[in-house]
């Protein structure tokens, strides 16, 4: 299939999943994950109307941003972020979805103050017990939100999570449910609005939609099999 056909197919799958879940498809957006694909693929997706793209690696985001040189693109960082990469995130990214510790929040705040800008962020929540998964333990999130509330440079929009890597649908669904309930709890107890739930990828987005996801991070279903990582 062409890229346009793949995008259309995924959009239809999302529409049907929303229908089954009794949700408005307008409440769920697709975030194309362009990691490991070249900037020409991003350019093709832009021709289809896409302007937001997610990257795991800061260096790859920077390379594509420089190659494309288009200020209309919104780059979203979704991978684990080392504090020594904060400068590049502040320069090139419009959103960070992997805020998972106070040290990183402090480093971001310092750089953002120097740059005179704000950054949309999502707190990454660890919703399973897999050692390979990163993110903040759910029980630590409420206090973390209170702590960083004074950081005017960080615009906390909601939560992101990666569900357990398993074929058991119920275990995947519970990961998403856990994060949605945590979001609801934080909104109720802290009187704040956290509209974004970035949950669900190519293999599990239908379950994420059932549990209230507002943003799906879709890569291979849109772009095809990933090329080898350089």
Locate the predicted segments by residue.
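Gly/Pro- and small hydrophobic-enriched strand-loop and loop-to-helix capping segments
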Residues: 213-230
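Conserved alpha/beta-domain cores
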Residues: 1-203, 209-211, 223
């Amino acid at each position: 299939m062409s890229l346009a056909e793949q995008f259309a197919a995924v959009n239809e799958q999302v529409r049907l999943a929303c229908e089954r879940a009794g949700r408005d498809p307008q409440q769920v957006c697709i975030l194309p994950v362009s990691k490991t694909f070249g900037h020409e693929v991003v350019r093709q997706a832009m021709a289809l109307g896409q302007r937001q793209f997610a990257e795991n690696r800061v260096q790859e985001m920077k390379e594509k941003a420089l190659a494309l040189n288009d200020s209309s693109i919104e780059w979203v960082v979704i991978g684990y972020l080392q504090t020594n990469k904060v400068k590049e995130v502040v320069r090139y990214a419009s959103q960070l979805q992997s805020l998972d510790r106070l040290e990183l929040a402090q480093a971001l705040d310092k750089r953002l103050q120097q740059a005179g800008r704000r950054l949309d962020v999502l707190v990454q929540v660890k919703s399973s017990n897999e050692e390979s998964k990163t993110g903040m333990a759910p029980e630590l999130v409420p206090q973390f939100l209170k702590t960083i509330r004074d950081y005017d440079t960080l615009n906390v929009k909601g939560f992101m999570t990666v569900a357990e890597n398993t074929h058991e649908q119920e275990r995947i669904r519970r990961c998403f449910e856990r994060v949605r309930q945590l979001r609801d709890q934080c909104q109720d107890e802290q009187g704040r609005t956290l509209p974004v739930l970035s949950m669900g990828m190519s293999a599990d987005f239908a379950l994420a939609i059932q549990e209230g996801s507002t943003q799906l991070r879709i890569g291979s279903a849109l772009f095809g099999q990933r090329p080898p990582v350089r």
